[in-house]
Amino acid sequence: MTSPIYLAIDTPHLDAALTLAQKVRHHVGGLKLGLEFFCANGHHGVHEMAKLGLPIFLDLKLHDIPNTVAKAIQALRPLEPAILTVHAAGGRAMLEEAKAVAGKDTRVIAVTVLTSLDAPDLEDIGLTGTPHDQVVRLAALAREAGLDGIVCSGQEVKSARKAWPGGFFVVPGVRPANGRIGDQKRIVTPAQAMSDGASILVVGRPITQSSDPDLAAREIEATL
């Protein structure tokens, strides 16, 4: 069985990223490459990471006018990512364009509410209601726009799964029971997230900042 854990690679250094991924490759199901990595290493870096044989989750959280996002995704198609993220807040037309131009084997996933945000943060940017309310609303939009799923915290995934049984749900910000929270605000344990309906988990610092990343990955995997 393939592990649902995707390792978050948050470093600009390609050599360090490759070394880390090689250490844990047998205990994770894929690699999530974010803005920091992509801005430093571009297409070349993604190709190098893909040589390890793990699915690539390209987490660029694209958010712009529909035409610009569509052209950006067309430029990314040669990378053949297994998963690609866009911001749900970009609107229906942007989401529809994103899915229309993505490769047939790429899941296009909508980011709903970042796990670093809580209700006061949403109020600061003019959004009323709770993060849960916003996630449910944006999940419905993503589904209607034809996307494959959403990114949400473990606190909302149960409701999202109930409303969208066939959706693909990415849950970041998970922390082992004894793990440090850091800058995350809406967290659950990996086991709870999977029990509530997550499709895959994004795990970064609990593995990458461990003195033994492979052991950390195995310990998290053992709880699932």
Swiss-Prot record:
Protein residues bound to substrate: 10, 32, 59-68, 115, 175, 184, 204-205
Keywords, ordered alphabetically: Decarboxylase, Lyase, Pyrimidine biosynthesis
Main EC class the enzyme belongs to: lyase
Pfam families listed in its UniProt record: OMPdecase
PROSITE patterns reported in the protein's UniProt record: OMPDECASE (PS00156)
Catalytic machinery residues: 61 (proton donor)
Superkingdom, natural source: Bacteria
Membrane-crossing segments per the record: none
Gene Ontology biological-process annotations: 'de novo' pyrimidine nucleobase biosynthetic process; 'de novo' UMP biosynthetic process
Catalysed reactions, as listed in the record: orotidine 5'-phosphate + H(+) = UMP + CO2
InterPro entries assigned: Aldolase_TIM, OMPdecase, OMPdecase_AS, OMPdecase_bac, OMPdeCOase_dom, RibuloseP-bd_barrel
EC number: 4.1.1.23
Gene Ontology MF terms: orotidine-5'-phosphate decarboxylase activity
PANTHER family registered for this protein in UniProt: OROTIDINE 5'-PHOSPHATE DECARBOXYLASE
Protein name, per record: Orotidine 5'-phosphate decarboxylase
Annotated source species: Sphingopyxis alaskensis (strain DSM 13593 / LMG 18877 / RB2256)
